[in-house]
Amino acid sequence: MALRFVTFATACLLCAATSVFAHARLTISDPAEGATLRASPPAISLTFSEGLEPAFCHVTLAAASGEPVDLDREKVGGDGSTILSASIPNSLVPGRYVVKWNVLSTDGHKTSGTSKFTVAP
């Protein structure tokens, strides 16, 4: 009986430790990675696996040539929210685009990455 309890307690601790030390992973991007869109998207929305620290989260958009694209209203939905978004105020011309993001999760881990999409009406 004692061995079962110790095994159960150890398993619980390992599961808890795994979630505590997890980094925020990008789970959903809109536009989706590799998507080809018929029209310019109105916004970028990135959903992560962990809560985010709003003051330390940023997203940028650039044409494949590296030319930056203006974004408006960059925001995280609030303390602990998992969504980082920004509006695209002007229609994008046809071409390839790169979304770059840097976030700090509520557990203090920094992560970054990219996502690409194409506008081809």
Predicted regions and their residues:
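Cleaved targeting-peptide boundary
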Residues: 20-29
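Interdomain boundary/hinge segments at the C-termini of tandem beta-sandwich modules
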Residues: 119-121
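Short, exposed beta-strand-loop hairpins at the edges of beta-sheets
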Residues: 93, 100-116
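Cleavable N-terminal signal peptides
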Residues: 9-10, 20
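N-terminal signal peptide c-region/cleavage motif recognized by signal peptidases
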Residues: 15-19
